[in-house]
């Protein structure tokens, strides 16, 4: 399994992306953060999966782990001692969506960390503004689908245990049939998102 995860991450790093997208996995630290997260999950057998839209520039764009900013990574996954990399441990990056998602995960109080991924695993941004987020286009989502399918296969997550966080993720998961939808926490969706995760 470790070899499959290694190959998966190497494939991410080798993906050629467009001029309005950042391949965050060109960075060795983000690759290692993702590897540590996926290996920890494999050992602890996740019981459900959350699929979002794409990495945000304050969250996954910094850590390499979906729905996870540096603050949540330190609080719930590991510290530098465990091998996780932080750009500045004295001033941790925070993202609203990451805080909401992790808050709901902890509120479930089941001791389980879900497998988390995105419809498109690279960071799409607006023209002339790298520190921004952009909805992935159709071509990008086609690229993203192969990574999503591979990760689902690696972890053998049953269809009924996969949840779409947001409409982009719901559309991307359409090939599986009807998938449970959870509202994305951005743009006023916090309460509905939390309720959705708690109801899993």
Describe each PLM feature range:
Residues 132-136, 175-182:
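Short, low-complexity, polybasic intrinsically disordered segments
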Residues 2-161, 169-171:
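A polyanion-binding, active-site-adjacent surface
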Residues 177-200:
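Short, flexible loop segments at boundaries between secondary-structure elements
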């Amino acid at each position: 399994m470790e070899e499959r995860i290694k190959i998966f991450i190497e494939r991410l790093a080798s993906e050629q992306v467009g001029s309005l997208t950042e391949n965050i996995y060109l960075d060795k630290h983000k690759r290692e953060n993702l590897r540590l997260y996926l290996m920890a999950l494999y050992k602890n057998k996740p019981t459900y999966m959350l699929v979002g839209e794409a990495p945000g520039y304050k969250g996954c764009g910094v850590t390499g782990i979906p729905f996870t900013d540096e603050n949540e990574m330190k609080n719930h996954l590991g510290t530098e001692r465990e091998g996780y990399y932080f750009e500045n441990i004295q001033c941790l990056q925070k993202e609203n969506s990451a805080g909401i998602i992790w808050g709901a995960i902890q509120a479930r109080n089941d001791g389980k960390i879900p497998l988390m991924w995105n419809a498109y695993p690279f960071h799409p941004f607006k023209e002339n503004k790298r520190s921004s987020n952009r909805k992935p286009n159709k071509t990008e989502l086609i690229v993203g689908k192969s990574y999503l399918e591979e990760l689902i296969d690696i972890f053998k997550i049953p269809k009924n245990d996969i949840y779409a966080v947001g409409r982009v993720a719901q559309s991307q998961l359409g090939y599986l049939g009807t998938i449970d939808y959870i509202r994305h926490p951005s743009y006023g969706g916090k309460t509905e998102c939390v309720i959705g995760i708690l109801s899993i």
